[in-house]
């Protein structure tokens, strides 16, 4: 899905974004500008507001104030499916697939939904061949071609996450949000999955929320550190690792510890 041309050279922009629940402000004036094709890791302690931020970007929550822009187009007030068809897609922390459908059927559903399938029989027939071809392509991209007719419920956890990645990119979105994509995986599965993410998101803008520092520092071009609903640092992995504010607020020795353990 090609982005609609807009006045901005940035793929995604957050401008003084705020979100309150009752009297509690969870997101406190976040500003972020992400160039097309950049990979951004979002880290921070539990309760920092990372998932809320993803929900604001993807349209699940409406901002209290501020703006979310996709290639210069304001997303405020748009529903998640509208945002998806504008070129932004997300995966969730909890695997979000159709367990009783096969791998192929899951991917085909993702393709048809992204096409704006209107549930009319003639349009369904017209779209079906293209959707089948795209689903086959997605199976190859996610290394699931040998699992084509296996029900999703019978896949390993890592395979289910790969399937969800396939569904997420099914419509060709240019901006991808991944929420803890490697959570629950073994070290070897994580290593393979990072490689898969890099392969299937080539040329795309990627934002990833992740607690595994090895994943974040190995995947991201830039890292945004969120603490108490604010971005306290946004820089390259090396610069963030050396930032005293980040170490005091969040990282401490965790990066060094994880790297020493081989993460």
Would you name each region that the model predicts?
Residues 2-263:
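Glycine-rich phosphate-binding loops of nucleotide-dependent enzymes
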């Amino acid at each position: 899905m090609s982005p609609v041309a807009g006045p901005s050279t940035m793929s995604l922009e957050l401008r003084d974004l705020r979100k309150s629940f009752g009297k509690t402000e969870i997101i406190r004036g976040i500003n972020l500008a992400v160039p097309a094709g950049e990979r951004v890791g979002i880290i921070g302690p539990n309760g920092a507001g990372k998932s809320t931020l993803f929900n604001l970007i993807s349209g699940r929550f409406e901002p209290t104030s501020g703006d979310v822009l996709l290639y210069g187009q304001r997303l405020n007030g748009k529903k998640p499916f509208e945002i998806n068809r504008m070129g932004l897609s997300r995966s969730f922390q909890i695997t979000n697939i159709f367990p009783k459908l096969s791998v192929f059927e899951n991917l085909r559903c993702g393709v048809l939904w992204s096409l704006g399938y209107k549930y009319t029989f003639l349009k369904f027939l017209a779209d079906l061949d293209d959707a089948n071809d795209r689903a086959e392509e997605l199976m190859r991209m996610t290394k699931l071609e040998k699992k084509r007719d296996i029900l999703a419920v019978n896949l390993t956890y890592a395979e289910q996450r790969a399937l969800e990645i396939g569904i997420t990119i099914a419509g060709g979105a240019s901006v991808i949000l991944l929420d803890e994509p490697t959570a629950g995986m073994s070290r070897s599965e994580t290593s393979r999955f990072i490689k898969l993410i890099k392969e299937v998101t080539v040329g795309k803008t990627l934002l990833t929320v992740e607690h595994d520092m090895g994943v974040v520092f190995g995947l991201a071009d830039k890292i945004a550190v969120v603490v108490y609903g604010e971005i306290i640092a946004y820089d390259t992995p090396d610069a963030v690792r050396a930032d005293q504010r980040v170490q005091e607020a969040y990282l401490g020795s965790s990066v060094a510890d994880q790297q020493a353990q081989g993460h």
